[in-house]
Amino acid sequence: MTFKPSTVALALVLGAASSVTSVSTAWASDGCGRASWYALTSRTASGERMNPAKLTAAHRSMRFGTKVQVTNARNGKSVVVRINDRGPFIRGRVLDLSKAAAQDIGMIRSGHAKVCYEIIS
């Protein structure tokens, strides 16, 4: 059985594109970086009113409603938050947590912390 060079080239390009997509998707779903917290009461990007007492967070691209486990890298404390807003808009930050979520993982005083996060649903 023989294949035309153009068919082989197309298969290679499509195969490479699909592997790049899966790698970038995996990278976007879990990671580590700096998180901050906020306690505004304005409307979020999802349309709901921000409630600092709820376990919510902002992320630049995760779907609204996504549940994410966030762990403070310094003390190992974790919290599960629901993505309901967009942000953070400060370079180098990966998440903006509600005040309640920040309190649960012990980062109120510092205002920001290194965290690792993982999508759980």
Where do the protein language model's features map onto the residues?
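Secreted/periplasmic proteins
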Residues: T2-S121
